[in-house]
Amino acid sequence: MEHDADVGLSRFAADPVSLHRLVREAEIAAALRRAEAVDARGALDGTWRLLIAVAAAAPEELDALHAGTLAPVLEHDGHLGTELVGTLATYLRSDCNMNTTAAAGHLHRHTVAYRLDRLHELSGLDPRRPEDRERLGLALKAHRVAVAARER
Protein backbone atom coordinates (compact mmCIF):
# COMPACT_ATOMS: atom_id res chain seq x y z
CA MET A 1 0.00 0.00 0.00
CA GLU A 2 1.45 3.33 -1.10
CA HIS A 3 0.82 6.66 0.64
CA ASP A 4 1.76 10.13 -0.48
CA ALA A 5 2.14 12.99 1.94
CA ASP A 6 3.47 16.51 1.74
CA VAL A 7 5.51 17.57 4.71
CA GLY A 8 6.57 21.11 5.43
CA LEU A 9 9.48 21.98 7.64
CA SER A 10 10.09 25.21 9.47
CA ARG A 11 13.23 26.72 10.85
CA PHE A 12 14.34 25.72 14.36
CA ALA A 13 13.64 27.97 17.31
CA ALA A 14 14.24 27.21 20.97
CA ASP A 15 11.69 29.83 22.01
CA PRO A 16 8.21 28.30 22.54
CA VAL A 17 6.64 31.70 21.83
CA SER A 18 7.70 31.19 18.21
CA LEU A 19 5.79 27.93 17.86
CA HIS A 20 2.75 29.44 16.13
CA ARG A 21 4.94 31.19 13.53
CA LEU A 22 7.00 28.05 12.95
CA VAL A 23 3.88 25.93 12.45
CA ARG A 24 2.72 28.54 9.94
CA GLU A 25 6.06 28.28 8.10
CA ALA A 26 5.67 24.50 7.90
CA GLU A 27 2.10 24.88 6.58
CA ILE A 28 3.25 27.27 3.86
CA ALA A 29 6.16 25.01 2.89
CA ALA A 30 3.78 22.04 2.61
CA ALA A 31 1.35 24.09 0.50
CA LEU A 32 4.19 25.07 -1.84
CA ARG A 33 5.13 21.44 -2.18
CA ARG A 34 1.53 20.43 -2.93
CA ALA A 35 1.38 23.12 -5.62
CA GLU A 36 4.69 21.82 -6.99
CA ALA A 37 6.05 25.36 -6.81
CA VAL A 38 9.15 24.03 -5.10
CA ASP A 39 10.71 20.64 -4.54
CA ALA A 40 11.07 19.22 -1.04
CA ARG A 41 14.63 20.47 -0.64
CA GLY A 42 13.98 23.85 -2.26
CA ALA A 43 11.62 24.99 0.49
CA LEU A 44 14.49 24.64 2.94
CA ASP A 45 16.95 26.77 1.02
CA GLY A 46 17.80 30.39 0.32
CA THR A 47 15.18 32.71 -1.04
CA TRP A 48 12.30 30.28 -0.54
CA ARG A 49 13.08 29.94 3.18
CA LEU A 50 13.33 33.72 3.56
CA LEU A 51 10.02 34.32 1.77
CA ILE A 52 8.26 31.60 3.78
CA ALA A 53 9.47 33.22 7.01
CA VAL A 54 8.25 36.64 5.82
CA ALA A 55 4.87 35.19 4.83
CA ALA A 56 4.47 33.63 8.28
CA ALA A 57 5.56 36.71 10.23
CA ALA A 58 4.62 39.71 8.05
CA PRO A 59 2.47 38.76 5.04
CA GLU A 60 1.83 42.43 4.29
CA GLU A 61 5.47 42.68 3.17
CA LEU A 62 4.85 40.08 0.44
CA ASP A 63 1.70 41.98 -0.54
CA ALA A 64 3.75 45.18 -0.90
CA LEU A 65 6.34 43.45 -3.09
CA HIS A 66 3.54 41.97 -5.20
CA ALA A 67 1.76 45.32 -5.58
CA GLY A 68 4.96 47.01 -6.72
CA THR A 69 5.93 44.38 -9.28
CA LEU A 70 3.61 41.68 -10.61
CA ALA A 71 0.13 42.91 -9.63
CA PRO A 72 -0.49 44.93 -12.82
CA VAL A 73 0.90 42.12 -14.97
CA LEU A 74 -1.25 39.45 -13.30
CA GLU A 75 -4.28 41.71 -13.65
CA HIS A 76 -3.52 42.14 -17.36
CA ASP A 77 -3.10 38.38 -17.78
CA GLY A 78 -6.39 37.78 -15.98
CA HIS A 79 -8.38 40.26 -18.05
CA LEU A 80 -6.96 39.42 -21.45
CA GLY A 81 -5.97 35.79 -21.01
CA THR A 82 -2.35 36.56 -21.86
CA GLU A 83 0.60 34.64 -20.46
CA LEU A 84 3.04 37.41 -19.58
CA VAL A 85 3.82 36.02 -16.12
CA GLY A 86 4.16 32.49 -17.49
CA THR A 87 6.49 33.75 -20.20
CA LEU A 88 8.56 35.57 -17.59
CA ALA A 89 8.83 32.43 -15.44
CA THR A 90 9.92 30.37 -18.45
CA TYR A 91 12.39 33.08 -19.51
CA LEU A 92 14.01 33.09 -16.06
CA ARG A 93 14.10 29.26 -15.90
CA SER A 94 15.69 29.27 -19.37
CA ASP A 95 18.62 31.42 -18.23
CA CYS A 96 17.09 34.37 -20.10
CA ASN A 97 17.60 32.69 -23.46
CA MET A 98 14.94 33.85 -25.94
CA ASN A 99 15.25 30.79 -28.17
CA THR A 100 14.93 28.35 -25.28
CA THR A 101 11.98 30.32 -23.89
CA ALA A 102 10.29 30.33 -27.29
CA ALA A 103 10.80 26.59 -27.75
CA ALA A 104 9.49 25.81 -24.25
CA GLY A 105 6.34 27.84 -24.85
CA HIS A 106 5.89 26.78 -28.49
CA LEU A 107 6.22 30.44 -29.48
CA HIS A 108 8.16 32.49 -31.98
CA ARG A 109 11.05 34.35 -30.38
CA HIS A 110 9.48 37.66 -31.50
CA THR A 111 6.39 36.74 -29.46
CA VAL A 112 8.62 36.22 -26.43
CA ALA A 113 10.27 39.61 -27.04
CA TYR A 114 6.87 41.28 -27.38
CA ARG A 115 5.63 39.71 -24.15
CA LEU A 116 8.74 40.80 -22.25
CA ASP A 117 8.34 44.33 -23.65
CA ARG A 118 4.69 44.36 -22.56
CA LEU A 119 5.66 43.10 -19.10
CA HIS A 120 8.18 45.96 -18.91
CA GLU A 121 5.48 48.49 -19.86
CA LEU A 122 3.08 47.17 -17.22
CA SER A 123 5.51 46.67 -14.34
CA GLY A 124 8.17 49.28 -15.05
CA LEU A 125 10.74 46.50 -14.68
CA ASP A 126 12.76 45.23 -17.64
CA PRO A 127 13.48 41.49 -17.41
CA ARG A 128 16.54 42.04 -19.60
CA ARG A 129 18.21 44.22 -16.94
CA PRO A 130 19.93 42.24 -14.15
CA GLU A 131 18.60 44.43 -11.31
CA ASP A 132 15.04 44.29 -12.60
CA ARG A 133 15.32 40.59 -13.42
CA GLU A 134 16.36 39.89 -9.83
CA ARG A 135 13.37 41.81 -8.48
CA LEU A 136 10.97 40.09 -10.90
CA GLY A 137 12.34 36.67 -9.98
CA LEU A 138 11.89 37.45 -6.30
CA ALA A 139 8.37 38.72 -6.99
CA LEU A 140 7.48 35.48 -8.82
CA LYS A 141 8.61 33.42 -5.84
CA ALA A 142 6.88 35.80 -3.41
CA HIS A 143 3.65 35.45 -5.39
CA ARG A 144 3.84 31.65 -5.18
CA VAL A 145 4.51 31.85 -1.44
CA ALA A 146 1.63 34.31 -0.91
CA VAL A 147 -0.76 32.02 -2.81
CA ALA A 148 0.43 29.04 -0.73
CA ALA A 149 0.04 31.07 2.48
CA ARG A 150 -3.62 31.75 1.64
CA GLU A 151 -4.26 28.02 1.14
CA ARG A 152 -5.69 26.30 4.17
Describe each region flagged by the PLM.
Residues 1-152:
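Cytosolic nucleotide-utilizing catalytic cores of signal-transduction proteins
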